Amino acid sequence: MSKDDSIEFEGSVSETLPNTTFRVKLENGYEIIAHISGRMRKNYIRILTGDRVKVEMTPYDLTKGRITYRMK
């Protein structure tokens, strides 16, 4: 799968789960489970409940995603 196959959505973090995993409510109303991308983990970017985030998802599993950006 290439990087072009991923789907990007915006949403807000509704709940913090263990192991840097979050429940994210997307703009279209769906809730998914998302983890932090490696680059965000490496740069110690903190994500809290209520933060606006950009989530990258694969078309094969639309219930899980990767948080790639935290909005300011």
Swiss-Prot record:
One of the essential components for the initiation of protein synthesis. Stabilizes the binding of IF-2 and IF-3 on the 30S subunit to which N-formylmethionyl-tRNA(fMet) subsequently binds. Helps modulate mRNA selection, yielding the 30S pre-initiation complex (PIC). Upon addition of the 50S ribosomal subunit IF-1, IF-2 and IF-3 are released leaving the mature 70S translation initiation complex. Keywords: Cytoplasm, Initiation factor, Protein biosynthesis, RNA-binding, rRNA-binding. It comes from Xanthomonas campestris pv. campestris (strain ATCC 33913 / DSM 3586 / NCPPB 528 / LMG 568 / P 25). NCBIfam families: infA (TIGR00008). SUPFAM superfamilies: Nucleic acid-binding proteins. One of its GO terms (molecular function) is rRNA binding. PROSITE patterns: S1_IF1_TYPE (PS50832). Belongs to the IF-1 family. Component of the 30S ribosomal translation pre-initiation complex which assembles on the 30S ribosome in the order IF-2 and IF-3, IF-1 and N-formylmethionyl-tRNA(fMet); mRNA recruitment can occur at any time during PIC assembly. Its main location: cytoplasm. GO terms for cellular component: cytosol. Pfam families: eIF-1a (PF01176). It is found in: Cytoplasm. Residues 1-72 form the S1-like domain. PANTHER family: TRANSLATION INITIATION FACTOR IF-1, CHLOROPLASTIC. InterPro entries: NA-bd_OB-fold, RNA-binding_domain_S1_IF1, S1_domain, TIF_IF1. This is Translation initiation factor IF-1. The lineage of its organism: Bacteria, Pseudomonadati, Pseudomonadota, Gammaproteobacteria, Lysobacterales.
